[in-house]
UniProtKB/Swiss-Prot annotation:
Residues 1-29 have a biased composition (Pro residues). This is RNA binding protein fox-1 homolog 3. It comes from the Eukaryota. Residues 1-104 are annotated as: Disordered. It comes from Homo sapiens. The lineage of its organism: Eukaryota, Metazoa, Chordata, Craniata, Vertebrata. CDD domains: RRM_FOX1_like. The modification Omega-N-methylarginine is found at residue 223. One of its GO terms (biological process) is RNA splicing. InterPro entries: Fox-1_C_dom (IPR025670), FOX1_RRM (IPR034237), Nucleotide-bd_a/b_plait_sf (IPR012677), RBD_domain_sf (IPR035979), RBFOX1-3 (IPR017325), RBFOX1-like (IPR047131), RRM_dom (IPR000504). The keyword RNA-binding applies.
Length: 312
């Protein structure tokens, strides 16, 4: 049992904040540890001296090493399988993605069921589309397979085959590159302020008195549409029409051009020299004002109330 130690003797607290001198503490009694202290046997503890060695049990290490070896080997295999598991499912996932094929040079009589029947033997098809315009089939289309592996097999088998005398081509469909188009339009209603373009694309917008613009029929059908070169029919329609008779106040003379002014719009020369009968009763100055010959003051006090100005 532990021996009780006497309490240490400390001096009384200092008076008036002046520390007092501490006396050295009494020495603690030392205990001799050279011998062994008897311990009650009911605790079941045994003390060993440093010179005594532990008895080695034969076969303890041999039995421990195989157990440790058998435990570490399965852990290594499981770790390797865990690392390799994310790599294997990635390949089937890529193969399961849909893939679209571009089929060109197909017969013009082919429709969607015909194209589906041709490619359906290689796998499940999600979508079939043949491109048409107003005249019919354009000779190409698209086939979308559920898996890319089926699409690759169909492309290898059908590319270059002859179908009704036409060699079809099957390739992987690629996304179309979209260019940035200018959306700003400085003109009203999308019409350009040009006489020829206006007559072709918007004849009713540039209509002038005395000019037979085709505002119905073919022109109305193409109004506001993307013509893509189809305006020749409209242009030829009003080009083939006979020129209108000249108007005395040259209302039809809008563009005094050497070509259009003489052929289409009547021209200023037709007004000046093709009216001998009208010139006898009335004459006009260079500004298009027509004065009556009976007015005695037409040349002194200005134009009379009977003059008219040509419509523009």
């Amino acid at each position: 049992m532990a021996q009780p130690y006497p309490p240490a003797q400390y001096p009384p607290p200092p008076q008036n904040g002046i520390p007092a001198e501490y006396a050295p503490p009494p020495p603690h009694p030392t205990q001799d540890y050279s011998g062994q202290t008897p311990v009650p046997t009911e605790h079941g503890m045994t003390l060993y001296t440093p010179a005594q060695t532990h008895p080695e049990q034969p076969g303890s290490e041999a039995s421990t090493q195989p157990i440790a070896g058998t435990q570490t080997v399965p852990q290594t295999d499981e770790a390797a399988q865990t690392d390799s598991q994310p790599l294997h499912p990635s390949d089937p996932t890529e193969k399961q993605q849909p893939k679209r094929l571009h089929v060109s040079n197909i017969p013009f009589r082919f429709r969607d069921p015909d194209l589906r029947q041709m490619f359906g033997q290689f796998g499940k098809i999600l979508d079939v589309e043949i491109i048409f315009n107003e005249r019919g089939s354009k000779g190409f289309g698209f086939v979308t397979f559920e898996t890319s592996s089926d699409a690759d097999r169909a492309r290898e088998k059908l590319n270059g085959t002859i179908v009704e005398g036409r060699k079809i081509e099957v390739n992987n469909a690629t996304a179309r590159v979209m260019t940035n188009k200018k959306t700003g339009n400085p003109y009203t209603n999308g019409w350009k302020l040009n006489p020829v373009v206006g007559a072709v694309y918007g004849p009713e917008f540039y209509a002038v008195t005395g000019f037979p613009y085709p505002t119905t029929g073919t022109a109305v059908a193409y109004r506001g549409a993307h013509l893509r070169g189809r305006g020749r029919a409209v242009y030829n329609t009003f080009r083939a029409a006979p020129p209108p008779p000249p108007i005395p106040t040259y209302g039809a003379v809008v563009y005094q051009d050497g070509f259009y002014g003489a052929e289409i719009y009547g021209g200023y020369a037709a007004y000046r020299y093709a009216q001998p009968a009208a010139a006898a009763a009335a004459y006009s100055d260079s500004y298009g004002r027509v004065y009556a010959a009976a007015d005695p003051y037409h040349h002194t006090i200005g134009p009379a109330a009977t003059y008219s100005i040509g419509t523009m």
